[in-house]
Regions:
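N-terminal beta1-alpha1 cap of cysteine-dependent amidohydrolase-like domains
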Residues: 1-93, 103-105, 111, 115-147, ...
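Conserved G/P- and acidic residue-centered "switch" motifs that form tight phosphate/ATP-binding loops
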Residues: 96
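The feature captures the ABC ATPase H-loop/switch
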Residues: 99
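Catalytic histidine neighborhood in serine/cysteine hydrolases
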Residues: 189-193
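Generic enzyme active-site microenvironment
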Residues: 196
Length: 225
């Protein structure tokens, strides 16, 4: 029986690539929206997905004009589920907005807008699987054990980024060109890994990105917990 993964989302169309990536590694996605008000009872891991900007009030700031309208119910749900997952030592994979929420949950702050949008593709129509820039993975991190350290090409579509780092977490990757944080993790947890790019869009074209989901599946199946 495949292990179940709670997948947070608000747009059924956008959640499908995450679900597909999980199925590729033998996991069963259980999509959850804010209005579902569920706990993690009966699931074996948590996937925090992309979406709108985290409410700046959660890190003590007023929104800038470029900041998207917040979705407080989703912020509250994901804070609650992340807290529950960390407390129970369930594997957590956080992607894009998920990484930003992971940092804010731990007391960190965000850069509300990267001027000039250096981390968003200018292509129209954009191909989400196309790499946009290089990251450098920090040696001796969980991410390095999964992807190997050194440089990797990743896709990118975010206009916010980690500013002040939260507590109990470490940086596992940075953008080569401008030093923007691209990976975070909790070293004291069996698997609590966050990435700023969208590996779910690259799993069919880049074996390296599939490794991230394979490692998540291994942790969920008891391999590194």
């Amino acid at each position: 029986v495949p292990k179940k993964i709670a997948v947070t989302y608000e747009d059924a169309h956008k959640v499908e690539p995450y679900n597909e990536a999980l199925r590729m590694v033998g996991l069963e996605p259980v999509p959850i929206r804010a209005e579902d008000s569920v706990s993690l009872a009966g699931v074996d891991g948590l996937l925090l997905t992309g979406g709108p900007d985290v409410d700046p009030q959660l890190y003590g700031q007023e929104p800038l004009p470029e900041t998207q309208k917040p979705d407080p119910p989703r912020d509250r749900m994901e804070f609650r589920l992340l807290g529950e997952a960390l407390e129970r030592n369930l594997p957590v994979l956080a992607i894009c907005r998920g990484l930003q929420l992971f940092n804010v949950y731990h007391g960190g702050t965000l850069i509300q807008h990267l001027p000039g949008d250096p981390h968003r593709t200018k292509q129209r129509p954009p191909d989400p699987s196309q790499p946009l820039h290089e990251i450098r993975v920090t040696p001796d991190t969980k991410l390095a054990a999964i992807l190997s350290d050194g440089q990797h090409a990743v896709n990118s579509r975010h206009h916010q980024a980690v500013d002040r780092l939260g507590n109990h977490i470490q940086v596992s990757a940075k953008s080569v060109k401008d030093g923007i944080i691209e990976g975070l993790e909790r070293p004291d947890k069996a698997f609590a890994v966050a990435v700023q790019w969208h590996p779910e869009d690259q799993v069919r074209t880049d074996e390296t990105q599939l490794k991230l989901f394979r490692a998540f599946a291994k942790a969920v199946n008891g391999g590194s917990r």
